[in-house]
């Protein structure tokens, strides 16, 4: 089977994607697969470079990768791919839309407002949220462009910066609590990981710098673990995820708040999902096999 490892892309997370792709290539079973590295530098590259592969193993992140566009292109080309489908990918990439769905389903997520232009900034709404606040690009991952702000001046300055990353911004109530992440594979939960870091926020640098964070598998108290597991699986189902996903949460006063759901979480040595899988006895090469096998089954079930 010719496995195309799709990496690169046109988003701000291109370098993260290349790290993920190289890690996958180094650990795929060379006796089982013919591996075809495919680095995208522009959108049209996919159509030409992927035409002779049997399966696309996606190592992409951010826009044109994690947002459903590549998934839709591959479906048009008749090439099965890894992870969630086009619809789920697009929903999860849009923080505002995904939070609306989670709120509708009764899943706790921090209060927020969405902003598409500076002129629409409503200070009465901000006062209801209360500082500090978290400013995020509506579409993005790896905490790129994310910052905690403590007053209106800092907020306005950060909004100007984030609008350079994205046309929509999410301003979210800051939840100070215990940061955890829940990885799900084929509808089943992997061990929960706690994240403690030297930086105030688990930002881009912290995510890819082992020295700045402590990530460890934890056993939560039974009642809290049940709430966390229930919330993470509810997210996975409500947002129509498939194959694998990672649900990031903040726990405060015994309540798990969902921060976001990642349909193509990082897969480098420093990444959380592989660490969680390893804690469950699934080594990295085996995890890649399982992603390929499960994705092929799911695509078939979808009528692909």
From Swiss-Prot:
GO molecular function: ATP binding; D-alanine-D-alanine ligase activity; metal ion binding
Residues that hold ATP according to the record: 126-181
Pathway entry: Cell wall biogenesis; peptidoglycan biosynthesis
EC nos: 6.3.2.4
Annotated Mg(2+) 2 binding sites: 260, 262
Domain named ATP-grasp: residues: 99-293
Enzyme class: ligase
Annotated binding of Mg(2+) 1, by residue: 248, 260
InterPro entries: ATP-grasp, ATP_grasp_subdomain_1, D-Ala_lig_Van_CS, D_ala_D_ala, Dala_Dala_lig_C, Dala_Dala_lig_N, PreATP-grasp_dom_sf
Any Gene Ontology CC annotation: cytoplasm
GO biological process per UniProt: cell wall organization; peptidoglycan biosynthetic process; regulation of cell shape
Keywords: ATP-binding, Cell shape, Cell wall biogenesis/degradation, Cytoplasm, Ligase, Magnesium, Manganese, Metal-binding, Nucleotide-binding, Peptidoglycan synthesis
Localization: Cytoplasm
Catalytic activity: 2 D-alanine + ATP = D-alanyl-D-alanine + ADP + phosphate + H(+)
Cofactor: Mg(2+); Mn(2+)
Pfam family, one: Dala_Dala_lig_N
Location (main, coarse): cytoplasm
Keyword Transport found: no
SMART domains named in the record: GARS_A
Cofactor binding note: Binds 2 magnesium or manganese ions per subunit.
Family: Belongs to the D-alanine--D-alanine ligase family.
The protein's role, per its UniProt record: Cell wall formation.
The protein, known as: D-alanine--D-alanine ligase
Taxonomic lineage from the root: Bacteria, Bacillati, Bacillota, Bacilli, Bacillales
């Amino acid at each position: 089977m010719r496995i195309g490892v799709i990496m690169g892309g046109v988003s701000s997370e291109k370098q993260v994607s290349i790290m993920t792709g190289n890690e996958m290539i180094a650990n795929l079973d060379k006796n089982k697969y013919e591996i075809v590295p495919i680095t995208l530098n522009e959108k049209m590259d996919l159509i030409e470079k992927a035409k002779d592969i049997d399966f696309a193993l996606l190592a992409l992140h951010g826009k044109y990768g994690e947002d459903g566009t590549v998934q839709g292109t591959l479906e048009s080309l008749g090439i099965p791919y890894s992870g969630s489908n086009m619809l789920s990918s697009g929903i999860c990439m849009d923080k505002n839309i995904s939070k609306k769905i989670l709120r509708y389903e009764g899943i706790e997520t921090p209060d927020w407002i969405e902003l598409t232009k500076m002129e629409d900034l409503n200070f009465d709404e901000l006062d209801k949220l209360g500082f500090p606040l978290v400013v995020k690009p509506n579409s993005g991952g790896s905490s790129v462009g994310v910052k905690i702000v403590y007053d209106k001046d800092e907020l306005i300055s950060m909004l100007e910066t984030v609008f350079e990353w994205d046309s929509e911004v999410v301003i979210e109530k800051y939840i100070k609590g215990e940061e955890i992440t829940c990885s799900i594979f084929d509808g089943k939960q992997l061990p929960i990981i706690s994240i403690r870091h030297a930086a105030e926020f688990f930002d881009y640098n912290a995510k890819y710098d082992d020295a700045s964070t402590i990530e460890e598998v934890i056993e939560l108290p039974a009642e809290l673990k049940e709430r966390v597991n229930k919330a993470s699986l509810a997210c996975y189902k409500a947002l129509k995820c498939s194959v694998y996903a990672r649900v990031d949460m903040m726990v405060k006063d015994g309540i798990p708040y969902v921060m976001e759901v990642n349909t193509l979480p990082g897969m480098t040595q420093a990444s959380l999902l592989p660490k969680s899988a390893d804690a469950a006895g699934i080594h990295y090469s085996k995890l890649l096999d399982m992603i390929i096998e499960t994705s092929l089954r799911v695509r078939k079930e979808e009528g692909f």
